[in-house]
Each structure stands twice: as C-alpha cells, then as structure tokens.
Amino acid sequence: MDGSKFDDAQTGEQKIRNFNINFGPQHPAAHGVLRLVLELDGEIVERCDPHIGLLHRGTEKLMESRTYLQNLPYFDRLDYVAPMNQEHAWCLAIEKLTGVEVPRRAQLIRVLYSEIGRILNHLLNITTQAMDVGALTPPLWGFEEREKLMIFYERACGARLHAAYFRPGGVHQDLPDELLDDIDLWAMEFPKVMDDIDGLLTENRIFKQRNCDIGVVTEDDIQKYGFSGVMVRGSGLAWDLRRAQPYECYDEFDFQIPVGKNGDCYDRYLVRMEEMRQSLSIIRQAIAKLREATGDVLARGKLTPPKRGDMKTSMESLIHHFKLYTEGFHVPEGEVYAAVEAPKGEFGVYLVADGSNKPYRAKLRAPGFLHLQAMDYVAKGHQLADVAAIIGTMDIVFGEIDR
C-alpha cells in the first residue's frame, strides 16, 4: 500500500483527538471567575490552561494616585473572604517605613481579628470544597458560624465585609468589653460545630476517595512554584510566618503549626481543620491578654487623627485632623517588604515610597496567584472530576489573583 494513502487505513479508534472544554468562568466550582481550558483524553486531563484577568481592576495602578489611608480599603477587596488580614500587611509596611510603634492593645486586637479572619476563610474553604465533591450539608453549618463572625466584624467597625478597621499606627477604635465576652463565648461553643463537620467528613469514605492522593505537591514543587501557607504545610514543611518571622506580638502566643504528610487534597483539608483549632486557642489567649492590657489603640502622632476631645479645645489638633484627611501623611523615602501569614498563604506588600503622601509603587504578592500558576502541573493526569477538588484545596479567590 502506498504510504501517502495511510490515512485512509486508520480506524475511527486511531483518529480520536483530544477534546478541549471550558471549565468556567460561570461554573459553581470555579471559585469566582476562573476559566480553565482543559484538554482531555477521555476523562483524563492532559493539559490545564488557566485564563485569568476577568476580575482585574488595576488595583496596583489605582493605588499610586491615592493617599496611603485612601488605599487601605482596596485591601478589603482583594481576598474578600478574610478582609482584615490583607489590611494588616499594608499597615505593617507603612509602620516599617515610618518607624511607628503600635500600642500593645492595638497589637492584641489585630491578632484577635486576624485569627477570626483565618477561621472565616477556612470555614468557607472546607465546607465549599466538600460541596464541590458532593457533600451538601457542611456549607449550611459553615455559613451559620461565619454569620456570627461577620457580626463580630460589624460590632468592631460597623461593616460586615469591607472593614477598613486596621489603620497605620493601630486600629480605628477600641473594642467594648461585651464584644470580647461574646467572642469568648463563641470560641467556647465553636469546637462542637467543628466536631460535627469533622464527624461528617474526616473519615467519610466518599470524601476520602475524592481527596486522598489527589493533587499531590512535593517539597520540590513548593520550592519551584513559590507556594506558601497550607499548600506548604500540607506537604510536611512547618513554614508559618507567625513563627518564622513573628510580627505584632505573635511570639507571645502559644500555638502549634499543624503539618500534613502526603501533600494531597486530604492532608490540606486536615491541616485547615487543625489550624482552626489553633486559631481558637490564639483568640482565647488574645482575649485574656486584652482584659489586662489597657491604653490607647492608636499611636498618636502624624499618622493618626487626634482625639475628639483635643480637637474641641486645640487649634493645632483641628488643623492636624484637617491636613490628615485632605492631604494625608507623608511616608519617608524608601522601600520595604512586609508580609503576613494570611489564611491562603504569604500575603506580602512591596512598597516603594518617594517621600510624598502617595505610594510611588505598591506590589502585592497574592498567594493564590502562585498556587494557580501550578494548576497545569498539579492537575495533569487526574480525572476531570478531580479538578474541582484541586481548585478547592488550593483555596482560589479571584479578588487577590486578578487584583
């Protein structure tokens, strides 16, 4: 037979090509506006191409034309699942450059609300990831608890989601004692809900089949792709900025860093469950310390507004208040990198200041961006149904990825 006519001799079986499908951007398991172009060989993922940018708002560029204080609310809109953790990094960067010492009471409040944010995030992640693999009950329980935490946000600053509560030099206002009592009471009752979720998922045969040995990440991959947070700890590395590079007063707190062993979706789930228990312990310690720590919650100076009582009696205070909210404070020239252990990983701010009242450049390091980069590598060879499980444990939220 002539070689050029070989095509005719191929059977239908031999002519099968790989099949391309779009996963998202309006898919319920896509966690926001993620679009994955998947190349499938039957049910097996051969290639996974993430398309991002559908929620891009140009945050980093917008920040260059706003004062430092006006930029703070942008951080609530990055990872909108746990907003205060992002504000924290911005405040730390400004405080590093200006050399401001945050009062102890403000540091404790920041730690308290950062840990509440961590539980907010993990509750949403664990329960919705369970829903992605077929368990419909946990999200209902998780949202019930998140509602209570949202009310604690609201009682601290007036907003449920976009808080703008952390300020350079401290926090906006002090917490009433009743709020601390209520958070303490909630922290005593919450373990029961965790035990319920634990009982429903941890030893559940179907949940384990859908998560064990899926999306395995090795120590080598972590170094190559720049992972952080639970993606690192799920593979057995005890890397946590709260321990490795303590900020605020985390070095005073007694807590463990949970680590996994296999680096798969199931281990990442277990790490998040244990992290919530550790956060509860930190919350209770912070409340105990707050009952003893008295004093102001803002470092009074050029960065922060004067007390209302002073403004009514002192002309200088009134002028300072007016200048602060019209022109804003000036940050000395320099560059700094400040990072916090956000619920999703290392959230960092690289800030370049030129001595004016606006940042010259602010680069935001979103942990989810680096995790999503590895999606092709992690998903290759898995089945189509496993893609949802992998995205879920990567903890993708598009506000911070697209910025």
From Swiss-Prot:
PROSITE patterns recorded: COMPLEX1_49K (PS00535)
Localization in the cell: Cell inner membrane
InterPro entries per UniProt: NADH_Q_OxRdtase_suD, NADH_UbQ_OxRdtase_49kDa_CS, NDH1_su_D/H, NiFe-Hase_large
EC top class, as a word: translocase
Pfam families with a match to the protein in the record: Complex1_49kDa
Catalysed reactions listed for this entry: a quinone + NADH + 5 H(+)(in) = a quinol + NAD(+) + 4 H(+)(out)
Keywords of the record: Cell inner membrane, Cell membrane, Membrane, NAD, Quinone, Translocase, Transport, Ubiquinone
Topology class, membrane: Peripheral membrane protein
Enzyme Commission code(s) on record: 7.1.1.-
GO CC annotation terms, alphabetical: plasma membrane
An example molecular function term from Gene Ontology annotations: NADH:ubiquinone reductase (non-electrogenic) activity
Entry's family note: Belongs to the complex I 49 kDa subunit family.
UniProt subunit comment: NDH-1 is composed of 14 different subunits. Subunits NuoB, C, D, E, F, and G constitute the peripheral sector of the complex.
Record-linked NCBIfam families: NuoD, PRK06075.1
Function statement: NDH-1 shuttles electrons from NADH, via FMN and iron-sulfur (Fe-S) centers, to quinones in the respiratory chain. The immediate electron acceptor for the enzyme in this species is believed to be ubiquinone. Couples the redox reaction to proton translocation (for every two electrons transferred, four hydrogen ions are translocated across the cytoplasmic membrane), and thus conserves the redox energy in a proton gradient.
PANTHER family in the record: NADH DEHYDROGENASE [UBIQUINONE] IRON-SULFUR PROTEIN 2, MITOCHONDRIAL (PTHR11993:SF10), NADH-UBIQUINONE OXIDOREDUCTASE 49 KDA SUBUNIT (PTHR11993)
Protein name: NADH-quinone oxidoreductase subunit D
Organism field: Ruegeria sp. (strain TM1040)
